[in-house]
Curated annotation (Swiss-Prot):
Pathway annotation from the record: Pyrimidine metabolism; UMP biosynthesis via de novo pathway; orotate from (S)-dihydroorotate (quinone route): step 1/1
PROSITE patterns: DHODEHASE_1 (PS00911), DHODEHASE_2 (PS00912)
Designated gene of the protein: pyrD
Membrane topology: Peripheral membrane protein
InterPro entries to which the protein is assigned, alphabetical: Aldolase_TIM (IPR013785), DHO_dehydrogenase (IPR050074), Dihydroorotate_DH_1_2 (IPR012135), Dihydroorotate_DH_2 (IPR005719), Dihydroorotate_DH_cat (IPR005720), Dihydroorotate_DH_CS (IPR001295)
GO-annotated biological processes: 'de novo' pyrimidine nucleobase biosynthetic process; 'de novo' UMP biosynthetic process
Entry protein name: Dihydroorotate dehydrogenase (quinone)
Cofactor(s) this protein cannot do without: FMN
GO molecular function, one term: dihydroorotate dehydrogenase (quinone) activity
Keyword presence, DNA repair: no
Family statement: Belongs to the dihydroorotate dehydrogenase family. Type 2 subfamily.
Amino acid sequence: MTPYSLLRPLIFRIPAEPAHRLTIKALGLAQGGTTLAPTPSLAQRIAGLAFPNPVGMAPGFDKNAEVPDAMLGLGFGFVEVGTVTPRPQEGNPKPRLFRLVEDRAVINRMGFNNEGAQAVTNRLVRRRETGKHGLPGIVGVNIGANKDSADRIADYALMTRLMAPLASYLTVNISSPNTPGLRALQDEGALAALLDAVIEARGNMTTPVFLKLAPDLEPADIDSICRIAIEKQLAALIISNTTITRPVLRSAHAGEAGGLSGAPLRELALQRLRDFRKASGGAIPLVGVGGIATVDDAWERIRAGASLIQIYSAMVYEGPGLARRLVAGLERKVREAGLTSIAEAVGSE
């Protein structure tokens, strides 16, 4: 039992979105805390970046880059902020975030609510230039298009030009189910055109580009995405976003529209990771996301082909100490397997 498990019933009396906002405000008071020292057996160099451990904070938690250093201070090896769009947008009508407690899951239909590129740029510039929150650490930026955009590819190109100078890496998010038509950019022709625009917009900058994908894909889609990603020399694929499918759920909010994350996504996300590992032949690094809540979950995802992992929904149920527990557990798994580096375990199942 952890201190968080004692507090959780009280926290869950607050609706999900206001509780999240209170959490961000509380973490803002902790900005500048101590980061977790690199763990030699867990450290990896991927896409030219030195990850101190493979456990990352998924986007959606810190949408506006308000608390990246506080999250690094919780033990994360990297943090991904966003999704950020060119212009501020309110997102979908509330309520739009639901805890499914009996299923240890979350349904969201947030709709890329964020303060926009200018606000996030200001925070990242301040972080870099003032040193006030200038802790070392990998902070990626997840970029998206405005819902009412007349040219979504142009939005991604603009976001690339704005964020590439400030981000450790960029993630092109075309897999949210909560922006109508967005997932169509995963189609072969649209994806190639999008990535060409992003790469052109990046210009001479070397910021790695990741691509975040949906779990609700057909085998032919997976093959074409891998081919294009390798051809365009993307740095990594993130598998996966939330799902619009609905396994058997017990919670009262099970029928809510939106993307499902947490424990019910685990098997689907794991299978899609394996599918992408097979289709890519290991030619591109993979980031495993979806339903990871325990050390065994994390280790399984690594052995299935993920070089890195990300968590979010599990934090709702397990609390802020989860990242450090996963890091300690993965270090133990590497040692028990007789390995010197977690990189040796990637894809070893």
